[in-house]
UniProtKB/Swiss-Prot annotation:
Organism: Homo sapiens
UniProt EC number: 2.7.11.17
Protein name: Calcium/calmodulin-dependent protein kinase type II subunit alpha
Taxonomic placement: Eukaryota, Metazoa, Chordata, Craniata, Vertebrata
Listed cofactors: Mg(2+)
Region ranges (Calmodulin-binding): 290-300
Length: 478
């Protein structure tokens, strides 16, 4: 039976000029022929996508379908055809909010208040729908049209995640350096408050035209953010009302549990009583500074695009959605989205849980060991004499009779760990384990084993489902 290929996009829409470009996607203006309605089509080349990238695409489409709000770019349709996927969005023609501000003849604190109010309305809707954007920044704040007073629209949900209520978890290292929250940089569990931190950074820029945290060196930038090291320098901040500074302070609160929420921020007097609280004085210095800030952003974006194009052209394998490991470390990437959850951070996590498991074994701590093992775990190990062991009873015997008696110090070293990441929830680690210990006569000894462990993550917790260990069997002391 022949496979039926969907051609709905090709039949219903006509494509026009390019509006933007990513590593695996291009955005083009399109028209729904029968209705004569204009849209923006994000066209993803699915032939180049990994299984993980396919998952991310499905997640983005699912999230965008959920969100229906006047301050969010609306997804109207999602169509999959042979080799390409089409996401049909509102056509927003007003360009970036920050570019529009610098072209205005008049711009005041009250205007900044109105801008951040619309951004917060969008964020509140996301949070009410169980969505965290994770990449709020000027590039993703657009205007519906070029008309005066056009609505601000939040765009690009490529990094957005779905959360349950106020759930905090480690969803991976993702975002844009200058807008990352302290909890993400600390690699702590995080959730909705990361969006409010980014709103604080955006509001700061809206008021003076430069960011609260800035350093060409990314490591120093991250240290500033983790310490919450920003201030309100003279003279530019002298003309900003105390209420505006108060809202920034509440957004840029290091502790996410004490940070203001979107709903609370919308009730803040600087927003809810804008006409009487926010200053209406024209801020020419802010406009001038913002022009330089925009120019720097565009230059860095152009440099990064060139670097990525050179890398891809020279046959290097692209890291997916505008992201590249090599570029991430560059000081040029301060306004570029990064998503590091695929590689170094996740591999370090696997090494860490493996070290914790071995520590539990060395300490004879069966309770901790059981928490890190699936109840149906399988194993090949020297003590089982070539048999496949299932469950934890076989291992319990050695904890109770070997390690509990051996109170002498044990020192373990993991050598040459190799990690294979298998999707989001599974990983395999292979390494050599060197164990130093004192024998019954108090003489130092060294044992070596070669080990492979397969980890699986359930409900955010890593557990061993299988391991294979070679080397000499453990011997009970006489």
């Amino acid at each position: 039976m022949a496979t039926i290929t969907c051609t709905r996009f090709t039949e219903e829409y006509q494509l026009f000029e390019e509006l933007g470009k990513g590593a695996f996607s291009v955005v083009r203006r399109c028209v729904k022929v029968l209705a004569g309605q204009e849209y923006a089509a994000k066209i993803i080349n699915t032939k180049k996508l990994s299984a993980r990238d396919h998952q991310k695409l499905e997640r983005e489409a699912r999230i965008c379908r959920l969100l229906k709000h006047p301050n969010i770019v609306r997804l109207h349709d999602s169509i999959s055809e042979e080799g390409h996927h089409y996401l049909i969005f509102d056509l927003v023609t007003g360009g970036e909010l920050f570019e529009d501000i610098v072209a205005r003849e008049y711009y005041s604190e009250a205007d900044a208040s109105h801008c951040i109010q619309q951004i917060l309305e969008a964020v509140l809707h996301c949070h009410q729908m169980g969505v965290v954007h994770r990449d709020l920044k000027p590039e993703n704040l657009l205007l519906a049209s070029k008309l005066k007073g056009a609505a601000v629209k939040l765009a690009d949900f490529g990094l957005a995640i779905e959360v349950e209520g106020e759930q905090q978890a480690w969803f991976g290292f993702a975002g844009t350096p200058g807008y990352l929250s302290p909890e993400v940089l600390r690699k702590d569990p995080y959730g909705k408050p990361v969006d409010l931190w980014a709103c604080g950074v955006i509001l700061y820029i809206l008021l003076v035209g430069y960011p609260p945290f800035w350093d060409e060196d990314q490591h120093r930038l991250y240290q500033q953010i983790k310490a919450g090291a920003y201030d309100f320098p003279s003279p530019e901040w002298d003309t900003v009302t105390p209420e505006a500074k108060d809202l920034i302070n509440k957004m840029l609160t290091i502790n996410p549990s004490k940070r203001i929420t979107a709903a609370e921020a919308l009730k803040h007097p600087w927003i809810s009583h804008r006409s009487t609280v926010a200053s209406c004085m024209h801020r020419q210095e802010t406009v001038d500074c913002l022009k330089k800030f925009n120019a720097r952003r565009k230059l860095k974006g152009a440099i990064l695009t060139t670097m990525l194009a050179t890398r891809n052209f020279s046959g290097g394998k692209s890291g997916g959605n505008k992201k590249s490991d090599g570029v991430k470390e560059s000081s040029e990437s301060t306004n570029t989205t990064i998503e590091d959850e695929d590689t170094k951070v996740r591999k370090q996590e696997i090494i860490k849980v493996t070290e914790q498991l071995i520590e539990a074994i060395s300490n004879g701590d069966f309770e901790s060991y059981t928490k890190m093992c699936d109840p149906g775990m399988t194993a090949f190990e020297p003590e089982a004499l070539g048999n496949l062991v299932e469950g934890l009873d076989f291992h319990r015997f050695y904890f109770e009779n070997l390690w509990s008696r051996n109170s002498k110090p044990v020192h373990t070293t993991i050598l040459n760990p190799h990690i294979h990441l298998m999707g989001d929830e599974s990983a395999c680690i292979a390494y050599i384990r060197i164990t130093q210990y004192l024998d019954a006569g108090g003489i130092p000894r060294t044992a070596q084993s070669e080990e492979t462990r397969v980890w699986h993550r359930r409900d955010g917790k890593w557990q061993i489902v299988h391991f294979h260990r070679s080397g000499a069997p453990s011997v009970l002391p006489h």
